[in-house]
């Protein structure tokens, strides 16, 4: 019985403590701001198409397009859906019809992601984390704080447990996302992935030669990747660092120090930047989701004070 009580207290302490309703509302706003940039970056290729161009059949439609019978692309529709996506994201930020806005964002992402993946013939996974977060926002009462909805209607105050569980679930999902990526690597390639002359070296070479070579025999792009591929000793060191941080990522859930958390996540950001430069793994903007690991109330207050001071300044008239 004592052991069960201990487990129960630990469960409650982890999932239902630590955040206020204000924290949840601010997280919705800041994540929404990050999504504005993320959407544009992810769907830039779709937006380069001629909006009044001809319809094109998908050679390999994504599974849910196939299920719904969507067989071809209407260029103008993608632009309409993108405009709706950005409008709904702004609605999410402002807290205007919050749940409806979040639901529209999710549906628009499904459509535009389906278009992009059906063209490329490959399923991209960069929206996995943001989509899980949007789903948890949808289930939560995040639209009742720091929102237009809260000015229109009167809501009862959010209890600590109501504000904490969505954020803690987001944290847990992100931590396990990195942890399970190690399991996925080992399942696909075995421990060879983390050897100096294994899978990483192969990917580096492929990424460096994918753009071809000049007439002089020089690589058109990513020559740094090719140079690194010739150094299996360095690859071994980097691969072990990646192994350590991915296996150890769940430990961030128990780190109380804000500075230590920020230091760890800074290293993860450097990892994503390096992966983008060397291996063209395009998770470059995903670090905006790391805001879930911080209480944004003091950060927001600090920004309000300093931003207000900045806008209060006026250029002096010379002469």
Give residue ranges: language-model regions.
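Alpha-helical membrane-anchoring segments
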Residues: 1-319
């Amino acid at each position: 019985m004592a052991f069960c009580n201990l487990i129960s207290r630990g469960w409650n302490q982890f999932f239902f403590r630590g955040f206020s309703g204000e924290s949840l509302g601010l997280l919705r706003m800041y994540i929404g701001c990050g999504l504005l940039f993320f959407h544009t970056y992810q769907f830039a290729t779709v937006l380069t198409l001629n909006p009044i161009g001809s319809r094109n059949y998908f050679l390999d439609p994504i599974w849910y397009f196939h299920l719904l019978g969507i067989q071809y692309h209407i260029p103008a529709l993608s632009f309409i859906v993108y405009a709706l996506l950005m409008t709904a994201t702004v609605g999410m930020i402002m807290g205007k019809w919050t749940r409806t806005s979040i639901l529209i964002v999710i549906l628009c992402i499904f459509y535009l992601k389906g278009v992009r993946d059906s063209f490329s013939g490959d399923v991209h996974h960069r929206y996995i984390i943001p989509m899980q977060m949007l789903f948890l926002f949808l289930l939560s009462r995040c639209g009742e704080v720091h929102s237009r909805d809260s000015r229109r209607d009167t809501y009862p105050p959010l209890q600590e447990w109501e504000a904490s569980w969505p954020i803690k679930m987001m944290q847990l999902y992100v931590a396990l996302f990195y942890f399970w990526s190690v399991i996925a690597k080992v399942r696909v390639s075995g421990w060879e992935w983390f050897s100096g002359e294994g899978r990483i070296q192969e990917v580096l070479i492929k990424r460096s030669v994918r753009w071809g070579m000049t007439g002089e025999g020089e690589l058109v792009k990513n020559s740094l990747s090719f140079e690194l591929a010739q150094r299996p000793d360095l690859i071994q060191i980097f691969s072990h660092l990646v192994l350590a941080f991915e296996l150890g990522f769940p430990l961030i859930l128990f780190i109380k120090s804000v500075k230590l958390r920020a230091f760890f996540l800074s290293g993860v950001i450097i990892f994503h930047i390096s992966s983008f430069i060397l291996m063209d793994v395009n998770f470059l903007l995903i670090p905006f989701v790391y805001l879930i690991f911080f209480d944004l109330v003091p950060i927001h207050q600090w920004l309000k004070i300093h931003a207000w001071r900045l806008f209060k300044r006026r250029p002096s008239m010379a002469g």
